[in-house]
């Protein structure tokens, strides 16, 4: 069951009820939570485009708590983060794994954060194939191209060289918030809205 809380705001014109995500959107906050899939990507992309059209001079705040998911859906979000004119501040809370780690790193440099007890996990893309040998070969070539692309994005975002990224994504590589800062995936640890370590 997916329960979405409602908040009530009072103004001179009366009361207005919002679902919590709509209320957060008013403050330019986007929540990336759960598995990255096409439906989630479409919702995140629409919110990014809406907030950028509303005011491209103000930051967009993207809070991330996700195990990752679809590479194509994640890349659609990644491309939109880079497409919009507004700076996108990323804040990891809980976990940013797999494709979600790419999104955390894709925030505007200098504005990529994690809460103190967050984890970031990078690894190579996962995939499977079945069918005739030619289909399996095509799928294998595609996943190798995808790995090369994702690793280049991580290298560009972190400042690590591609050989280091290739080695470090060979297996699941879990990092604390501080390790992710040291690695270059994020820029700081956010203790609260005002205190950044």
Swiss-Prot record:
Cell wall biogenesis/degradation recorded as keyword: no
Kindly indicate whether the keyword Hydrolase belongs to this entry.
Answer: yes
Q: Which residues does the entry assign to the active site, renumbered to this chain?
A: 98, 123
- Give the gene symbol: clpP
The name this protein carries in UniProt is ATP-dependent Clp protease proteolytic subunit
Quaternary arrangement and interactors, per the entry?
Fourteen ClpP subunits assemble into 2 heptameric rings which stack back to back to give a disk-like structure with a central cavity, resembling the structure of eukaryotic proteasomes.
Q: Mind telling me which Gene3D superfamilies this protein's record contains? A: 2-enoyl-CoA Hydratase, Chain A, domain 1
Q: What does the UniProt function comment say about this protein?
A: Cleaves peptides in various proteins in a process that requires ATP hydrolysis. Has a chymotrypsin-like activity. Plays a major role in the degradation of misfolded proteins.
EC number of this enzyme: 3.4.21.92
Q: Which reaction does it catalyse?
A: Hydrolysis of proteins to small peptides in the presence of ATP and magnesium. alpha-casein is the usual test substrate. In the absence of ATP, only oligopeptides shorter than five residues are hydrolyzed (such as succinyl-Leu-Tyr-|-NHMec, and Leu-Tyr-Leu-|-Tyr-Trp, in which cleavage of the -Tyr-|-Leu- and -Tyr-|-Trp bonds also occurs)
Q: Which GO terms describe its biological process?
A: protein quality control for misfolded or incompletely synthesized proteins
Question: What is a single molecular function from GO for this protein?
Answer: serine-type endopeptidase activity
Family affiliation: Belongs to the peptidase S14 family.
Pfam families documented for this protein:
CLP_protease
GO CC terms for this protein?
Answer: cytoplasm; endopeptidase Clp complex
| Keywords attached to this entry | Cytoplasm, Hydrolase, Protease, Serine protease
Subcellular location(s) per record: Cytoplasm
Cysteine pairs bridged by disulfides in the record: none
Q: Where is the signal peptide?
A: none
